[in-house]
Design a protein with these regions (language model features):
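Amphipathic alpha-helical polymerization modules
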Residues: 1-187
Length: 187
């Protein structure tokens, strides 16, 4: 008889299919409709990539993640801004007291990769580029194959809990049937 070598997970693959959106009423929340990742300046000086667009302002007025990491390229909102507007092409403008028209303070740029599945998770919804992902192509939203930015929304998980629970129950039933088959064969 030959002894088995057991099983192990060879890899866990991330699936970057877009999730549903939920409206937040927060003008600093930004969802990406289509392909692309926000660029985030990490504390070690490297750039991380994320689709999590729940941003806030730090004490200097810069757009940052919930963990305080700066969005790249950096965008600073003036402290006296009355209104913040982000269009589908990533242009960020503010209305200031006494101004007759909004002022553009920056443009959000998105990164795309030849092979998104090659990105390596680093935690906190951040990923880093690898040889497998290729180098990022950076550009404005709605240019080339990049998605559009949507202000006041965040992207939800792309996993359907109900569907995954059904899959788990099916796997459990298959295991039980196979277990009974082996038990019957042993008797």
């Amino acid at each position: 008889a030959q002894l088995g070598l057991g099983v192990k997970t060879s890899s866990i693959q991330k699936i970057f299919i877009q999730g549903d959106f939920t409206q937040t009423q927060n003008p600093l929340d930004i969802a990406i409709q289509g392909k692309g990742f926000f660029q985030i300046s990490q504390s070690d000086g490297t750039i991380g990539y994320t689709r999590a667009g729940a941003f806030k302002l730090d004490n200097t007025g810069q757009l940052v993640t919930a963990d305080g990491l700066v969005l790249e390229p950096a965008i600073t909102i003036p402290t006296d801004a009355l209104d913040i507007s982000i269009d589908s092409q990533g242009s960020v403008s503010v209305t200031q007291p006494g101004a007759t028209a909004p002022t553009i303070v920056g443009t959000i740029q998105l990164a795309t990769f030849q092979n998104e599945a090659g990105l390596q998770a680093t935690g906190f919804n951040l990923f880093r580029q690898t040889d497998a992902s290729g180098t990022p192509t950076i550009g404005n939203p709605q240019s080339q194959d990049r998605g559009a930015t949507q202000q006041g929304f965040i992207e939800l998980s792309n996993v359907s809990v109900v569907e995954e629970l059904v899959n788990l129950i099916s796997a459990q039933r298959a295991y039980e049937v196979n277990s009974r088959t082996v038990q019957t064969a042993d008797e």
